[in-house]
Amino acid sequence: MVAMFQEDNGTSSVASSPLQVFSTMSLNRPTLLASSSPFHCLKDLKPEERGLYLIHLLLTCANHVASGSLQNANAALEQLSHLASPDGDTMQRIAAYFTEALANRILKSWPGLYKALNATQTRTNNVSEEIHVRRLFFEMFPILKVSYLLTNRAILEAMEGEKMVHVIDLDASEPAQWLALLQAFNSRPEGPPHLRITGVHHQKEVLEQMAHRLIEEAEKLDIPFQFNPVVSRLDCLNVEQLRVKTGEALAVSSVLQLHTFLASDDDLMRKNCALRFQNNPSGVDLQRVLMMSHGSAAEARENDMSNNNGYSPSGDSASSLPLPSSGRTDSFLNAIWGLSPKVMVVTEQDSDHNGSTLMERLLESLYTYAALFDCLETKVPRTSQDRIKVEKMLFGEEIKNIISCEGFERRERHEKLEKWSQRIDLAGFGNVPLSYYAMLQARRLLQGCGFDGYRIKEESGCAVICWQDRPLYSVSAWRCRK
């Protein structure tokens, strides 16, 4: 990974990322480096030195939080607050959001204090702001553009010759994807099909805006078109609301949605563990079950780490554990399989942020968000208010959820393509390799974006979008096995 470091004279120079350097160092004992140094001396550190120092502080702070040593965690947070900055260089900006997340996690350990501090704060669902931030992400990163292109290409190839097509969008928040599909269908030699799009979103206003844009474009192209809005959270969706009709060729598009079901699976697993203990208390580890029942299943193994400075051996990592045998994820995928789609295209974060311990998630998410912040650093000025909005309202909120939340509250449970492939395969789907033409178009799109650090890697017929060598997102296509 390569990062841009801005010198005092305002020019930029390319240097090794602090995380790249840090990854070659020993992780056995993260300690407070020069903990007695005056804060004013810390300000004089060179960018790379400061980046390394911030990483050590974050890991040390997280280690103290995990072990319950809150006084030491507070000391680390104080140093972090003097070095981290939401408008500084890449590592300072990342550290600012991880620092906030760790502090928030500490506050949550005192529910009374946490609730009292938040009692007078009102959360407003500003729909226009949410749409604006999603649009900024779409414009600043090529991720969604590539996802939409590959999804549309898979749909077009699956629907060749079909006269009635129904597309279900499980996150109907961005009309750009379907505007492009309308234009592509209009260019078919045999003419466009009758197209029906069902959009699922929890906010009515978002669906209304999408419907207006798509109906307007369909009328302009003279394509027979219907839009079916479904106002619902995905985890509350009843498949009957999708109104799938006999004779329609069905396609399903899921962009960054399936991972939200994993929180329900974790909640179900904790309840099942508690039930097994009630039925057979002598056969279950009492301490672990009690910890799970208090909403911290992922904390059940934190004590095992205290003698290893907060780092779990690789054999304990979440990626090596078997998939849950049942849950909301399986039920939802089974329900989609029951609709018999000709193709289902899934885009997900290709990261392992669903580790069972805080330290696992912190390390993995540090690397992922460092790559995402690097992407912005190479293209968008540091003073850009739009960049700050994306970092704070999108990435910052994801980081906070990954680090400070547990149990059902922790919804940003990103996992690797390998695990999603296992789940989808078990639900009765077979992989449809993305076509050579689709991959060629996607690579051309990346080249046209002017982001030299992006590349697309093919993995078992799927596309993995990377920044440098770091996988960020995956796109895979599936069809029902008979």
UniProtKB/Swiss-Prot annotation:
Keywords: Nucleus, Transcription, Transcription regulation. It is found in: Nucleus. Residues 302-324 are annotated as: Disordered. Residues 305-324 have a biased composition (Polar residues). Residues 250-401 are annotated as: PFYRE. Residues 45-479 form the GRAS domain. Expressed in seedlings, root epidermis, leaves, flowers and siliques. Residues 52-115 are annotated as: Leucine repeat I (LRI). A motif (VHIID) lies at residues 165-169. It holds the Pfam family GRAS. Probable transcription factor involved in plant development. This is Scarecrow-like protein 3. It comes from Arabidopsis thaliana (Mouse-ear cress). The gene is SCL3.
